[in-house]
């Protein structure tokens, strides 16, 4: 996994969150968006062929939960509301939609590894959505827990996440860049006034476990 966290307009992010969630603040007036470019090499007990994925997530907490500007991003940056989740195969889409309510769509995801890291381009319906170029962050072996939030049939779900492996985050990095395309999703992201410098770049290699969704409210 290569990823990065960028600041975004707080009001614009809040408009995209379902009722029951509020954005984690990067500053008093800014929220954040996390981009994650993922290669799944093995799914469960080889339940399906490997596939690629690109996550657009807004770091968020349940309404009323305590969070601290910026500090909470470094502990919850890979947690939050999953807004867009393109994948490269139909079985991967079906698994995510049917079990967890993830907003998965089939798209083209191209990874281009280079000496310092990896460049990932997502395109759908013949249009580019986003390109993310991230240098690998220093990592150590560790276990981290978090949560993703999705909406299914009008219910807000919380899915516990566990990451077990080599995980690293490097703050305030110029070694992560995004470029938006001409797809409608890109236009929506453009409206968020994304920051040009990453609040952090991320790298992970290990086991990623998603727990069953737990209802936490209605939307």
Could you tell me what each predicted segment is?
Residues 1-24:
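Short, extreme N-terminal leader segments that mark the start of a protein/domain
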Residues 86-219:
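Interaction-surface and assembly-scaffold signal
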Residues 18-25, 45-46, 164-165, 190:
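Intrinsically disordered, low-complexity boundary segments flanking structured domains
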Residues 1-3, 23-143:
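Structured soluble/peripheral alpha/beta segments that form catalytic or ligand/cofactor-binding pockets
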């Amino acid at each position: 996994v290569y990823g990065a966290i960028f600041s975004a307009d707080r009001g614009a992010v809040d408009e995209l969150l379902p009722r029951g969630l509020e954005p984690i603040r990067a500053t008093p007036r800014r929220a954040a968006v996390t981009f994650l470019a993922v290669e799944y090499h093995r799914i469960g007990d080889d339940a399906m062929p490997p596939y690629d994925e690109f996550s657009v997530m807004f770091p968020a907490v349940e309404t009323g939960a305590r969070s601290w500007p910026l500090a909470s991003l470094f502990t919850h940056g890979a947690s939050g509301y999953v807004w867009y989740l393109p994948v490269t195969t139909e079985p991967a889409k079906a698994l995510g939609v049917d079990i967890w309510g993830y907003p998965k769509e089939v798209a083209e995801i191209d990874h281009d590894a280079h000496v310092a890291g990896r460049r990932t381009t997502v395109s759908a319906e013949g249009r580019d959505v986003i390109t993310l170029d991230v240098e690998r962050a220093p990592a150590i072996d560790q276990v981290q827990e978090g949560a993703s939030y999705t909406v299914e049939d009008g219910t807000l779900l919380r899915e516990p996440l566990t990451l077990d492996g080599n995980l690293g985050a490097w703050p305030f990095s110029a070694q992560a860049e995004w470029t938006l395309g001409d797809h409608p999703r890109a236009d929506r992201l453009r409206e968020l006034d994304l920051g040009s410098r990453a609040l952090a770049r991320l790298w992970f290699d290990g086991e990623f476990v998603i727990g069953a969704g737990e209802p936490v409210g209605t939307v």
